[in-house]
């Protein structure tokens, strides 16, 4: 299967969006990558398609339990074998997931950064064929970032401990120059492809209104907010 066939088969698209193909090509060639792309630009495709084409397992380091669950649910619905390993699993569920991973049942495994240091997971990766490590929300490694997670600092040592160093892809929608430099340095990226796409979101805009009845406008805004909260937007 080619990357284009994977895009069409699993995602239903005929062409890649801006920046995706370059990152995919870099990771497939064994090169590290640092991609700064806005939310909704398709960052996940940049590591999910290589995961489908590479022979082994792709590990996706993610800081958010809810995001892992949503991503895995979506992948399974698409027919892509995936799982997550985080604190929401019971110990029995965790062991079962590792057993299935050892049996080659998954192509993509989402994992919390804290899990990388556990003895059971370390034993698993020593036996497994890890083809790619994708670091989602990579800005969490930087103390300059608003979501600093100390556990992200252990990712480079984890990667180096693998029997064979796989390519590492770092992905974020939030990166000032200082944060970008930290991601590169602290993740120990090796000659990475660095790509930053535009941040223009056509569906977002600013509007200044001057309502004649400010009280009515405020009540309308409160009602809209209440509706959004009810539907979890």
Task: Give short role names for the model-derived ranges.
Residues 41, 89-132, 140-146:
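Conserved helix/coil segment N-terminal to the catalytic DExD/H
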Residues 206-233:
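Conserved interdomain hinge at the start of the Helicase C-terminal
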Residues 69-92, 96-103, 182-187:
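Conserved helix-turn-beta segment of the N-terminal RecA-like "Helicase ATP-binding" lobe
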Residues 30-49, 60-62, 171:
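Walker A/P-loop
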Residues 29-35, 56-57, 105-107, 166-167, ...:
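Pre-Walker A (Motif I) flank of P-loop NTPase domains
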Residues 1-38:
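Conserved pre-motif I regulatory segment
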Residues 58-68, 225-233:
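Conserved strand-helix element at the start of the C-terminal RecA-like helicase core
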Residues 126-127, 131-196, 215:
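Post-DEXD/H (motif II) to motif III coupling segment of the RecA-like Helicase ATP-binding lobe
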């Amino acid at each position: 299967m080619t990357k284009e066939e994977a895009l069409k088969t699993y995602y239903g698209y005929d062409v890649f969006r801006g920046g995706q193909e370059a990152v995919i090509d870099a990771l497939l060639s064994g090169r590290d990558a640092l991609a700064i792309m806005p939310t909704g630009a398709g960052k996940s495709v940049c590591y999910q398609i290589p995961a489908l084409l590479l022979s082994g397992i792709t590990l996706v380091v993610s800081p958010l339990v809810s995001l892992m669950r949503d991503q895995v649910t979506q992948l399974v619905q698409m027919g892509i074998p995936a799982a997550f390993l985080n604190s929401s699993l019971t110990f029995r569920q965790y062991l079962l997931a590792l057993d299935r991973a050892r049996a080659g049942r998954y192509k993509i495994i989402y994992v919390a950064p804290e899990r990388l240091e556990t003895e059971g997971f370390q034993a698993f990766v020593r036996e497994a064929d890890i083809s790619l490590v994708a670091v989602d929300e990579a800005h969490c490694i930087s103390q300059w970032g608003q979501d600093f997670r100390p556990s992200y600092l252990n990712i480079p040592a984890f990667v180096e401990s693998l029997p064979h160093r796989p390519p590492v892809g770092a992905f974020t929608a939030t990166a000032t120059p200082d944060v970008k430099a930290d991601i590169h340095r602290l993740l120990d990226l090796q000659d990475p492809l660095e790509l930053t796409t535009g941040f223009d979101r056509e569906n977002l805009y600013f509007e200044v209104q001057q309502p004649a009845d400010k009280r009515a406008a405020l009540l309308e805004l409160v009602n809209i907010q209440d509706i959004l909260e009810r539907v979890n937007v």
